[in-house]
Amino acid sequence: MSLLRRKQPDDQPIASVALPQCTPIAETQPRQHVWVKGKVIRMTARPTSGQPALAISISDDTGTVTAVWTGRREIGGVTLGRKIAIDGVPFMHGDHLEFTNPGYTLLPK
């Protein structure tokens, strides 16, 4: 598995990218690799151990998860209302699931 974050090549239309089977957020289990997709409903910049971190909340019809990218204040193309798919291994953070530095794919608007 590559440690690099996946981005779509500039010459490949996003709509042509095939995603693996996405799991509904409500069915996502901690410590199991999954793909989830939904709409960005909240974005905050929050420092973690003195480093910048971007946190976004992603919601589908079944629930909400949080994704945090450490060392980032923003990610190009990630805006409120944008559809996004993320993949990674979520962990429980308090009472909700959180992905740390997940891979992501921006979906058509």
Language-model segment annotations:
Residues M1-K37, I41-S49, M92, L97-K109:
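OB/S1-fold single-stranded nucleic-acid-binding modules
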Residues V34-V36, L54, I84:
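Hydrophobic core residues within well-ordered beta-strands of beta-rich domains
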Residues V68-W69, N101:
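Residue-level recognition of conserved beta-strand positions in structured domain cores
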Residues K37-I41, S57-S59, D87-V89:
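Residue-level recognition of well-ordered beta-strand positions that form the cores
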Residues M43, P47-A67:
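OB-fold (S1/OB) nucleic-acid-binding surfaces
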Residues Q29, R72-D87:
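Short nucleic-acid-contacting surface segments enriched for D/E, G, S/T with interspersed K/R
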